[in-house]
Design a protein with these regions (language model features):
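Short, Lys/Arg-enriched N-terminal segments with co-localized hydrophobic residues
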Residues: 1-11
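PLP-dependent enzyme catalytic core of the Aspartate aminotransferase-like
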Residues: 9, 14-15, 337, 344, ...
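A glycine-/small-polar-enriched, mobile loop at the entrance of the PLP active site in fold-type I
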Residues: 14-65
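Active-site phosphate-binding strand-loop segment of PLP-dependent enzymes
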Residues: 21, 121, 133-187
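Active-site C-terminal subdomain of aminotransferase-like
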Residues: 26, 204-288, 302
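Conserved N-terminal alpha-helix of the aminotransferase class I/II PLP-enzyme fold
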Residues: 43-90, 97, 112, 120
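PLP-dependent aminotransferase-like
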Residues: 88-155
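Conserved PLP-binding catalytic core of the aspartate aminotransferase-like
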Residues: 297-342
Length: 387
């Protein structure tokens, strides 16, 4: 299950990392970063030490933006921003900057992150309407909302839901209502028509980079003057602050942006969004096919709503609605045994989210097919030994 490489004579075993984020990065990128750690591009310094205003760093952030535009085919009337605070800060920024005309917004609740976003907007005084929810079935599917109408300032969706392993197979029609999407866990895992959205954002630590930077793509006409944001909006939470200052109003997370730039070049080398998507479909199908044909495991997300990135699954010892102590104890025992033995076999971070239980394999862009195959081999062995 593990593969090895050597750094300066130290033998190190790499594990297959199925973490929901921060998650594995492409090995080629890590090697490049290691090689440039002490001296990047002949500057005699590490990117970690560079002044963000220096001629050494400027080309890095400019290239990162250019690569985002190229790979995501971003239309010219959109700004590409690099901000801090993760996806969670975007819950507030979206509300503060977009909820300013009627003060109303429509949210589709497909899980924890969409719900938190709606709660944050409501907290800031936006009149939030939850127009659809999949809570009735434990968020195991994406509700069909083909069309969103009304006097909303914006409509909000979480495009891929990491905890429940669900993903939109369609983009809701919103007419003149700007559509906002959290694409943190699926950015560049597939082709996406940016022009169908008013705003896209992605915390980078799942598919793009280490934690510390959030990518925002916003249509220019949706960026209000600071004074037009909701009352009391802090300067740092206005998109205009970042748009007017080339994402350098204050010190950006330089090193994270540098790694992001390298990951974008790695994606391009692998065929761009379309090429990566082909690989992602192959990986996900390999795992789902095994789960669907197994009498020991089952996937929790409904067909037609399944994520290519996050695959939660249960064993036969997880009984829906069980209250019997013995049954619950057995379930807990099997789950922790699975996680522990997987770890010993070099397959790490497979523990499921407490809301779903069981296990979860996050198989983002950087996870190779070999990692998924290693997981399935382990699952077969575990099923055989514990049936």
């Amino acid at each position: 299950g593990t593969y090895e490489y050597v750094i300066r004579g130290y033998q190190m075993a790499r594990v297959w990392n199925f973490s929901a984020g921060p998650s594995c990065l492409p090995e080629d990128v890590l090697k490049e970063c290691a090689a440039e750690m002490m001296d990047c591009n002949g500057t005699g310094q590490s990117v970690m030490e560079m002044s963000h205003r220096s001629s050494a760093f400027e080309p890095i952030i400019q290239d990162a933006e250019a690569m985002v535009r190229k790979l995501m085919k971003v239309p010219e009337n959109y700004k590409v921003l690099f901000v801090q605070g993760g996806g969670s800060t975007q819950f507030a920024m979206v509300a503060e900057n977009l909820g300013i005309h009627t003060g109303k917004a429509a949210y589709i609740e497909t899980g924890v992150w969409a719900k938190k976003a709606a709660q944050e907007a409501a907290k800031l005084g936006v009149e939030v309407t939850t127009i659809a929810s999949s809570k009735d079935k434990g968020y195991s599917y994406i509700p069909k909302v083909e069309k969103i109408e009304g006097d909303y300032d914006y409509a909000y969706i979480c495009f891929n839901n990491t905890i429940m392993g669900t993903h939109y197979e369609y983009i809701p029609e919103t007419g003149n209502i700007p559509l906002v999407a959290d694409i943190s866990s699926c950015v560049l895992s597939e082709e996406l028509d940016v022009s169908k959205f008013g705003l896209l954002f992605a915390g980078a630590q799942k598919n793009l980079a280490p934690a510390g930077v959030t990518l925002v793509i916003i249509r220019e006409d949706l960026i209000p003057e600071l004074d037009d944001c909701r009352p009391g909006t802090p300067t740092m939470l206005a998109y205009k602050t970042h748009a007017d200052n080339g994402s350098m109003y204050n010190t950006p997370p330089c090193y994270t942006i540098y790694v992001l730039d390298k990951v974008l070049h790695w994606i391009e080398k692998n065929g761009g969004a379309a090429g990566i998507n082909k690989l992602n479909v192959e990986k996900a199908n390999y795992l789902y096919d095994y789960l669907d044909n197994s009498d020991f495991y089952r996937a929790t997300a409904e067909k037609g709503s399944r994520s290519l990135m996050n695959v939660p699954f249960l064993t036969k010892y997880s009984v829906a609605g069980a209250t019997d102590e013995a049954v619950l104890a057995k379930e807990k025992e099997i789950n922790s045994k699975f996680v522990k033995e997987a770890e010993a076999a070099g397959l790490v971070n497979l523990k499921g989210h407490r809301l779903v239980g069981g296990m979860r394999a996050s198989i983002y862009n950087a996870m190779p097919l070999a990692g998924v195959k290693a997981l399935v081999e382990f699952m077969k062995k575990f099923a055989e030994e514990n049936k």
